[in-house]
């Protein structure tokens, strides 16, 4: 039986055996998936993330704005689980802070030795074919690890 009502106490014996660890990740606002925009970080709430699904890490959550990352599976309103304090590798989707203190969510392509700049790419071929952002320098504020969305 999944549920037991013995001695007037409702219990679920199988679920009692499961011990799920959670980490609390702050939902700190939104991030534009288009051109860099200035955003403030304000904790709206904390979200419990099961370690068995998300792993351990220093995570925070952002709400996606815009449509420039739809080909990467990120749509307007999706929640993004971002790992902070980790290095970005080529191909990662990053929260990038530019020299003007504006941030955006883009795919990190790498460094262009000819133009001496970092390349961040849009992921919406239909609307932004081959469009990129070129930056002399930027700070990686985190790497996107998971997308949470409603079906």
Where are the predicted features?
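Glycine-centered tight beta-turn/hairpin loop motif at sheet-sheet or coil-to-beta transitions
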Residues: 100-101, 125
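Flexible glycine-/small-residue-rich
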Residues: 29, 98, 122
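Catalytic Cys-His active-site segments of thiol-dependent hydrolases/isopeptidases
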Residues: 115-125
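Hydrophobic beta-strand signal
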Residues: 61, 81-82, 95
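Low-complexity, intrinsically disordered Gly/Pro/Thr-rich segments
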Residues: 123-135
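Conserved PDZ fold ligand-binding element
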Residues: 76-84
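Short, positionally conserved secondary-structure boundary motifs
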Residues: 1-70, 75, 90, 101-103, ...
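Short coil-to-beta transition motif at edge beta-strands of beta-rich domains
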Residues: 88-95
